[in-house]
Amino acid sequence: MSDTPHQAARHDRLTRLFHWSMALLVAAQFAIGWTMPDVHGTAPPLGLVLLHVNLGVLLLLIAVPRLLWSGARRPIAQVEQPRALAFVANATHTLLYASLIVVPVLGWLNANGRTWHVGLGSGFSLPAIAAPHTLGATIGELHSAWATVLAILIGLHACAALAHRFVMKDGVLARML
C-alpha cells in the first residue's frame, strides 16, 4: 500500500445518513442502557427505561429500510485487500447488520413478555410478537448479552476504519464521511 491515500468511491448520501443516524442511536442506546435502572417484573417502563424502549423502536424502524437499501443499491467498488481481511470485513458487517435487527427484536420480545406497550409515544405502537410470559427476564438477559456482542463488533468496526485511515491509507474511512 502506498503512503498517500487514493480516492475511493464514496457511499451515497442515503447510505451515509442511515449509517450515522444509526450510529448515534446505538451510542445513545448504550449510554441509556448502562445508566438506566434495572428492570424488574412487569412494572411499566418509565424515565430512561421508556426512552430506551422508544429509541429501540426507532432503531428498528431505521434498520429495516437500511437493510433493504443496502440490498437494493449497487455496491460501490471494493478496495483491494488480502482475502483474509476481506473475509473478516464481510463477516463483521454481516454480524453488525444482524445484530442491529436482533438486539431490538430481543428488546421487543422482552417488553412483550413484561406486557409493556412498545412504540413511539402514544401515537405509534408495534404489535405484540409474543404473548406475556415468564421469560421476560431471560429474554432481557439475552438482549443484554447480544448488545455486548454488538458493542464488540462496533469496536472492531471502528478500529478497522481507523486502521484503513492511518495504517493502510486506502481511503476506506473517507467513503462513509
Regions found by a protein language model. Give the residues of each.
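Membrane-embedded alpha-helical bundles that constitute the cytochrome b-like, heme-associated redox core
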Residues: 1-177
